[in-house]
From Swiss-Prot:
It comes from Hyphomonas neptunium (strain ATCC 15444). The lineage of its organism: Bacteria, Pseudomonadati, Pseudomonadota, Alphaproteobacteria, Hyphomonadales. Pathway: Amino-acid biosynthesis; L-homocysteine biosynthesis; L-homocysteine from S-adenosyl-L-homocysteine: step 1/1. SUPFAM superfamilies: Formate/glycerate dehydrogenase catalytic domain-like, NAD(P)-binding Rossmann-fold domains. InterPro entries: Adenosylhomocyst_ase-like_sf, Adenosylhomocysteinase-like, Ado_hCys_hydrolase_NAD-bd, NAD(P)-bd_dom_sf, S-Ado-L-homoCys_hydrolase_CS. Belongs to the adenosylhomocysteinase family. This is Adenosylhomocysteinase.
Length: 469
């Protein structure tokens, strides 16, 4: 069932795009075998009946398939995008037209973004959600910091970025409109499942400080998410985004990737596969050694800035590309980010210079010495801002994990402490297994003797929890 709410309990760019969205959703379903298998397996038992899910995750065609899967399993859903540029408007229209409360369009302002996040939590019957499905942690942090402000709002007067200015302003609005709302709403949440590295890091920090208010399932570190979505997804979507944004010839160019985690590995492979000569920066000696042995030059951003043509940040950290770095670049260097937040690049510092908008999500910044850079998606996620994100097939694995996590939290959330958990190995293997037939993969089967020899069951799990893949 869907969250059939009051008329106009949604905001999308153009509801007439719904039919176009439905056609693409139908195509995506054929590429998302994990989610379709979840509907078949769990649909009859309705394990999410009674679940009231607030979802903050890129409102794409693939996410539409996830939303409709959650609803097919019994949930009521309200949704926003977790990035101002990542919505696919026809996907949002199709979901809204089907009766789901969704508040998202491509090109939101920061004020709208936080207003929509608040509206996602406002159920028509006055009750709140009992589950959160998050990507980056914004929905979770809205409740946590909002409750903090109910007892001491002084920090709201000290935003440290443009993003925080609008974030804190929205908290103030809700404090004025509904005193005590944050505490009440947070108390009703059984748990959160988190999609991405940045959001998971926030959750672990909260747990470490003893401030995590409910159980959390770290979907990002499921092997069938991080080793597939983060790596193989970026491997296909990064170059797609840069090409759509700039029409640049990759072959022969020097491309630099900051960070060599799973996202950085996929990004470097993407650029190298297009003929670019790739360099990498890293703080972790293990990842740096991996990059070197994968054939990439490893150097610092200070060294790379004047030498390379294309720059991609993929660290999950802040201030990776500073204004000084960008001023040192070649004329017309291309700058983009594939990490979750835009603070990997010092975009606010660039506001002091001349901006020329070339087309949506493509800007040229001119420095006083006449040199220019091309900035994609204002430093936000380039693969969703300048292209359509990861392909459906790889997102099927990620979103099947999300579905399993939501079922677990709904049925057994009260059995968990307020800590961060990962899904067990047998579910990781199950998600992978669901995607093999689509690729024509035939698994080898262990004999009883072989299984006993290595100490596993014939049907798995085949690796210990600590295995790194």
């Amino acid at each position: 069932m869907s969250a059939k709410a009051a008329p106009q309990d949604y905001f999308v760019k153009d509801i007439s795009l719904a039919e176009y969205g439905r056609k693409e959703i139908a195509i995506a379903e054929t590429e998302m075998p994990g989610l379709m298998a979840a509907r078949e397996e769990f649909g009859p038992s309705q394990p999410l009946k009674g679940a009231r899910i607030c979802g903050s995750l890129h409102m794409t065609i693939q996410t539409a398939v996830l939303i409709q899967t959650l609803e097919a399993l019994g949930a009521q859903v309200r949704w926003v995008s977790c990035n101002i540029y990542s919505t696919q408007d026809h996907a949002a229209a199709a979901i809204a037209d089907a009766g789901t409360a969704v508040f998202a369009y491509k090109g939101e302002t920061l004020e709208e973004y936080w207003d929509y996040t608040d509206r996602m939590f406002q159920w028509p019957d006055g009750e709140g959600p009992n589950l959160i499905l998050d990507d980056g942690g914004d929905a979770t942090m809205y409740l946590i910091l909002g409750e903090k402000a109910e007892s001491d709002p002084s920090f709201l007067e000290k935003p440290t970025s443009e993003e925080e200015k609008y974030f804190f302003a929205q908290i103030k609005k809700r404090l004025t409109a509904s005193p005590g709302w944050f505490k009440k709403t947070k108390a009703g949440v059984r748990g959160v499942s988190e999609e991405t590295t940045t959001g998971v890091n926030r959750l672990y920090q909260l747990e470490k400080r003893g401030e995590l208010p409910f159980p959390a399932i770290n979907v990002n570190d499921s092997v069938t998410k991080s080793k597939f979505d983060n790596k193989y997804g970026c491997k296909e979507s990064l170059v797609d985004a840069i090409r759509r944004g700039t029409d640049v010839m990759m072959a022969g160019k020097k491309a630099f990737v900051a960070g060599y985690g799973d996202v950085g590995k996929g990004s470097a492979a993407s650029l190298a596969g297009s003929g670019a000569r790739v360099g990498v920066s890293e703080v972790d000696p293990i990842c740096a050694l991996q990059a070197a042995m994968d054939g990439f030059e490893v150097l610092t951003m200070d060294e790379a800035a004047p030498k390379f043509d294309i720059f991609v940040t993929a660290t999950g950290n802040k201030d990776i590309l500073t204004v000084d770095h960008m001023r040192a670049m070649k004329d017309m260097a291309i700058v983009c980010n594939i990490g979750h937040f835009d603070n990997e690049i010092q975009v606010e510092g660039l506001r002091n210079f001349q901006w020329t908008n070339i087309k949506p999500q493509v800007d040229m910044i001119t420095f006083p010495d006449g040199k220019r850079i091309i900035l994609l998606s204002e430093g936000r996620l380039v693969n969703l801002g300048n292209a359509t994100g990861h392909p459906s097939f790889v997102m099927s694995a990620s979103f099947t994990n999300q579905t399993l996590a939501q079922i677990e939290l709904h049925l057994r959330g009260n059995e968990y402490d307020n800590k961060v958990y990962t899904l067990p190995k047998h579910l990781d293997e199950k998600v992978a297994r669901l995607h093999l037939d689509k690729l024509g993969v035939q698994l080898t089967k262990l004999s009883g003797e072989q299984a006993a020899y290595i100490g596993v069951e014939q049907t798995g799990p085949f690796k210990p929890e600590h295995y790194r893949y």
